[in-house]
């Protein structure tokens, strides 16, 4: 039998007459709908939109007269009707007909023109109680005919369902009996369904990892998964990947959606596949396999924002299978538990770590909920405690820089003088020049830092706009600072507006350092949410109203009433206003859009006056417009803004703490990755032996120790690694879980460890 991976054999199909032209047969059946027809429909038949082909006409030497139709002839409609009904007796005479006409069941004559659906797929699509009696006869007929392209491995050929095979359909129909029948007859268990319908994208689709094993896992068919992995004919490989490099574990991560029903399905299947992999291929670490984006299943969950499966992988603990666990219970006493978490792929000391993915590359707007999961929460807190001095040093440097900035801006020379200070040996000018140079250097430093920040997040900056709020303001401050200083040294007076704008942004950006404290940090988060969610929308609508009413008032003011122009030699003098009349008359006129907008803004904040010139021609219309503007803006929009801001504060109150945690995490990683901080990153945790590997060697991992109090499951008996929190000989002590370098050994061979007292539980 031809192997599934063998290349197609070139051959010419035969034509024995009687085939209907595709355009005539399908006339009136064209699909004018917005979507493509499904693979199988009881309301629409298969089409005949075949691509042009060169065939051998078997009736070439026969007479040209009209011939009677052959009653033994099998066309596609007869074959499809027989297999869809599941009546194998209707296939009598099919082997003889195929042998007589040199045809195969995979010829285009027996497939659907647009999709390439075969009679075997048609039979599998029409199962009754999980079986179809025509499947086995079709496979036997195809095998006996010597088909160089076996029917069992035929796939759909269109862009939408490309690669879809009968085995995929049998798995989707949840028929283990049909799956066994196909695999026993040579079905390719690694066939890839890579059409657009099976790719993750916009619109209706179902991405399951393309492979039959992934489809069975994603549809919760453990019996099919077990058979595919352990069948004696062609066992499926857990290491097989799809066109994106994703394994079955990656596919399970992709289909998770954080709902209770879905996560129960995904986690049970995920754990089952890990245990099956440990039994079938113990030397392979399935969770270390990376896809084409260089992501493991854990990193993929972090990047896609799959919170629940991410939590499950991080906190997975198997009893008796320590080499598959990422969490280990070291010691417990009542509800108090000391747990060890595996930091592989998590700590920022590694390239493309989970922490960096969440902070800089995650697509989900809810990624702030991942940084509060253990061990990330305590790990980030430990890093923060270590980097607090650097954080406040940055704050002190920025504060000094802003004082220098303020002093230079306050002592600027008048615009009539030269903008840049004279290079004379005077104390005032020298200090002013030095201040300008320091401001320029600080602006360049800040600009380079922010450009590097946005370069690292160039794809996802708009997705995570909320936590990049200050970084965007810092970027604008740096740009304004550099441009203003360049204009200053070029003696261009427009440097001053840019300078004071940068000064205002600089003082506002000092609020960035409020994230170092919980109360001010959460308050800052709420301010950002209100600005980005409510205030921006209010300003957009308000500007539309303001521009429309301003243009209307300017147009009406141009039609002010004037006396009729007299005739005679004194005509010019009679139309000129009296002394003081021009100022009085033009004071209330809306002579331009800017003046009208300023007057209307006064109405918005309740400071406008309805007094206007008596000589306005459309006095009533102007009054009506002003009243309408007051109703729409001062009464409607402002009160709506207040209500929306209150709702926003209430809705984000539960997430403000986690968003603040995420902002702290970004600050921690930025301080670790500082372009001027040339110190090597410190690794967190400690190297411990948590068990043995399948080959008997010790299982050593970098672990991070976390103290937890869990009243929900404290009655469970869990295996522990030691009898007390720190090991024998050191009562009531616990190794410091903060950042640590690899332990050094002293002369006696004992490792140097820092110990801190265990926090005691106190009850009132």
Swiss-Prot record:
InterPro entries associated with the record: Ankyrin_rpt, Ankyrin_rpt-contain_sf, Ion_trans_dom, TRPV, TrpV1-4
One of the Pfam families matching this protein, by short name: Ion_trans
Q: Does the keyword Membrane apply?
A: yes
Q: What is its main location?
A: membrane
What SMART domains does its record include?
Answer: ANK (SM00248)
Positions carrying Phosphoserine: 6, 751, 763
Keywords in alphabetical order, please: ANK repeat, Calcium, Calcium channel, Calcium transport, Cell membrane, Cytoplasm, Glycoprotein, Ion channel, Ion transport, Membrane, Phosphoprotein, Repeat, Transmembrane, Transmembrane helix, Transport
Per the record, ranges on the Cytoplasmic side are 1-390, 456-471, 515-537, 643-764
Q: Where is this region: Disordered?
A: 1-46, 562-585, 725-756
Query: What are the disulphide bonds in this sequence?
Result: none
Query: Can you summarize the PTM annotation of this record?
Result: N-glycosylated. Phosphorylated by PKA.
Q: Where in the cell is it found?
A: Cell membrane; Cytoplasm; Melanosome
Which segments occupy the membrane without traversing it?
Answer: 572-609
Q: How does it sit in the membrane?
A: Multi-pass membrane protein
State the ANK repeat positions. Answer: 72-114, 115-161, 162-207, 208-243, 244-292, 293-319
Q: Which CDD domains match?
A: TRPV2 (cd22197)
**Is the DNA-binding keyword given for this protein?**
no
* Extracellular membrane side: 412-434, 493
Which family would the database say this protein is a member of?
Answer: Belongs to the transient receptor (TC 1.A.4) family. TrpV subfamily. TRPV2 sub-subfamily.
Q: What is this protein called?
A: Transient receptor potential cation channel subfamily V member 2
UniProt source species: Homo sapiens (Human)
